[in-house]
Structure formats: structure tokens, C-alpha cells
Amino acid sequence: MNWKKIMAVGLAAVSMMAFVSGCGSDTKKADTQLPKKIVIGLDDSFPPMGFKDDKGEIVGLDIDLAKEAAKRAGMDVEFKAIDWSSKEAELKSKKIDVLWNGLTVSPEREKNILFSDTYMKDKQYIVVRNDDNAIKGKSDLASKVVGVQQASTGESALQNDPSGKTVKEVKSYADFVSAFMDLGIGRVDAVIADGVIARYLMTKEPGKYKIVEGTDYGVDNFAVGFRKDDTALRDKINSILAEMKKDGTADKIVEKWLGSSADLDKSDAK
């Protein structure tokens, strides 16, 4: 073997070592990009996803999912109540690191938020008092007062649907609990709400409210929200959520709060 061949073999070996070393460095770099603690922003009046219990502690379906995910990622987690209508500003200003609270994916939100894979699916429904037989469909909202949560998917759904053009008034609330209270006493005629929260609140006051069947405003995909450049954190949470769906942990958490895991999206559980 002449010296040119020796040099070629040597350079190839060095290049291979550099490649392997580089891969190791990239992996290590990706790991170090993950924070030791994450602050999760949420609306703490959004049962059963996240809310304060009788002791003033923040609990809920998303809280349990987030705690388990953070545990598996080796991170500490803090839950911070925020003004939900300012959620994107809170995330961008780094007052919080993550949005995890029944957050629906939408093209408008995708402009400012990096979303995880979908972990649950839901729909927006018309909810009325149980004794109200006048509202049987979207067209019956004409000349009615309708309640929505401010900056919610339900608010957007009503605004973008023809039925929203015929209502008498749209009343925006800081949270769904307040909207349902006003529905109960007749201040509004209907509320546009997520099926998950509607069914949960209906179980707390049996016989008081009902969902108007066949009035959904399309399917909502629940996902976790991150800053646009937090791809490493997003990818880690995606991986962990897929594991939780595969090993049954996610099913148990959803069943605990909803009685069934039918709304859980397992398309990424491999």
C-alpha cells in the first residue's frame, strides 16, 4: 500500500470518528436543551382539565397528565393560573413555558404556538337549560343571548358559523363556570362549550343542563402548546405522551376524570 492509500484510509477513519463523535454531541446537546423545570400556564376554572378543588389546590385531567409526563422527563413542574385570553402573550414573554389546559389546535394559533401531537379529541356543543325545548338546533339561536368563554374555540366557532350572525348578543366570560351559572339563572339562553367540560359540569348539577344533540361545531384536537423554537421540549413531551398511551397510563387518567377514555387520541401510540 503506497502512502496515498495510507493517507486516504487515515482520513476516512478520522472522518468516521468525527461523525460518531458529532452524533454523540448532538444527542448530548439535545438533552441539555431540556429545562430542569417547566411552568405550565392554565385557566384554573376549566374543570375537569384544570381547576381549583375545595382545598384551593389545582387539580384535573391535564394536571395529572402533565405531572406524569414531567416525572418521566425528570423535570420539576409548576402550574400557574393565567388570563386565558392572554395565553399566547404569556408564552411568548416566557412567563410560562407550556400551555396545557384543553388547548385546541387551530390555524390561527399555529402561527404563534408550536403544538404537540393531539392527545384528545372533543367537540363544541350548544348547551341549554334542561327545561328549554325552544333551542333544538343552531338556527334556533336567532335572537338569543349566547354565552362563550373569552378567546375560546367556542367563541371562534360561533363567530365563524352562520348561526353566530343571527344571535341577539354574545356574552363573553372569563371562564365556563361563570357562563354556566348565568345559563342556570337565565341571563343567557345558551352556552357554546367543549363537550368535555359540558358533560363534567352536568354531572355536578344533574338535571339542570343538557347538550342539544346534533349541534356540534366540528372536531377539536387538544394538544400541548410550546414556544415556536422549543422543538426539543415538544419532541420529548410527544415521546412521553405516546408512551403513556401505549402503557395504559393515559387511559387510567382520562377514565378517572371522564369515566371513559373514548376521547383519548391513540393514533401516535405505537
Regions found by a protein language model. Give the residues of each.
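Ligand-binding clefts/hinges and TM-proximal coupling segments of bilobed small-molecule sensing domains
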Residues: 25-30, 153-171, 210-213, 242-270
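Acidic, polar ligand-binding/catalytic clefts
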Residues: 67, 76-140
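A ligand-binding cleft/hinge motif common to bilobed small-molecule-binding domains
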Residues: 103-111, 159-160, 182-185, 189-218
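Extracytoplasmic small-molecule ligand-binding "clamshell" domains
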Residues: 30-102, 236, 247
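Short helix-initiation/N-cap motifs at beta->coil->alpha
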Residues: 63, 79-91, 133, 170-185
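Periplasmic-binding protein-like
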Residues: 44, 121-128, 199, 203-238, ...
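Ligand-binding cleft/hinge of the Venus flytrap
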Residues: 52, 66-75, 154-173, 202-206
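Extended ligand-binding regions for polar small-molecule ligands
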Residues: 24, 63-72, 132, 139, ...
